[in-house]
């Protein structure tokens, strides 16, 4: 389940490359890194649900934002994109 869900999100990200703005490309690449780390963390545990992916990626983003990794504008861009990607992947 978890690998399939990751694949759906990555396919959505890959599908944006041809028409995405520079900001969207930045956000998608940034999210790809957080998603990959979250999946690796979750694979060693018992909860392989889509909700666990959402929670783990969201917590990772919150930690990065708290550490000052993103400007306020980029914070909004990345978190909005994450929510949109998660919703789209959940509906597939």
Curated annotation (Swiss-Prot):
InterPro entries: UPF_YfcL. GO terms for cellular component: cytosol. This is Uncharacterized protein YfcL. It comes from Escherichia coli (strain K12).
